[in-house]
Amino acid sequence: MFGLKVKDAQKDDQKSSEYLSGEAGSQAGGSTQGTSTTTQRRGSSNENKVKVLQVAMKKKSDSEDNGQIELETNNLANAPIKRGSNNNQQVQLKADDFGTTSSSESGQSGTQGSTPSNPGPWTPWLTTEQIHNDPAKFAASILILYDAPYARNRTAIDRVDHLDPKVMTANYPPSWRTPKWNHHGLWDWKARDVLLQTTGFFNPRRHPEWFDGGQTVADNEKTGFDVDNSENTKQGFQKEADSDKSAPIALPFEAYFANIGNLTWFGQALLVFGICLS
């Protein structure tokens, strides 16, 4: 009773191109141009006017894709942020874009007079130099507890590596040397997250002894999936001699890590902060 009444789609041969009524449109050479106009909302006051973005479309000939309409040009890329360089296509954030949202936080960060409506400029509360001055406080070690099917008790525990904050941030560009935006696109609210801003730290290729002999072949020749199976089920990496048998791989949990930050617990991997197991 209520709702949309759906009918079969029908083509109207008399309407080869359309544009919104009320807009100043020009139709020439098989193209339709919708110019930039303004629309008023809730009265006639100037502050309620909304600018309409310009979009140009053209209709292909009947021999091209059944005469479909394609987008020719638009100016959506120029809106809504216009600060920057290179024809306003590159946005450059300033310190004023980030700030405290309450007066209590502003007193701690050294920004006086900040309000939710007028936040003060953002300043890092922990710099890389402060981390370097006290490496024992911010250093971390990683302990891994994983299933080892070839071990006697099927369990292995190992220390993978030690996170040295000075080494981790040594090759960072200057804009990454504070707990701000890291190169994973994550915001570092905690200082210890800086320790996990590494590229390739959890890369299983750094420890080839974790894998069996079939891993080398799989990295270069096989995908690990049965491409002939419509369900694309995982078959595991196998040697040529055992290709007729199912041989799923049991990997330590480090192998499933990517270049991820902000991790404290993942699977059965435990990150222990403030402990040096050298």
UniProtKB/Swiss-Prot annotation:
Region (Disordered): 1-86, 98-126
Organism: Mycoplasma pneumoniae (strain ATCC 29342 / M129 / Subtype 1)
Family in the record: Belongs to the adhesin P1 family.
Alphabetical list of InterPro entries matching this protein: P1_N
Upper classification of the organism: Bacteria, Bacillati, Mycoplasmatota, Mycoplasmoidales, Mycoplasmoidaceae
Biased composition (Basic and acidic residues): 1-16
Pfam families registered for this protein in UniProt: P1_N (PF12378)
The protein's name in its UniProt record: Uncharacterized protein MPN_412
Segments of skewed composition (Low complexity): 33-45, 99-117
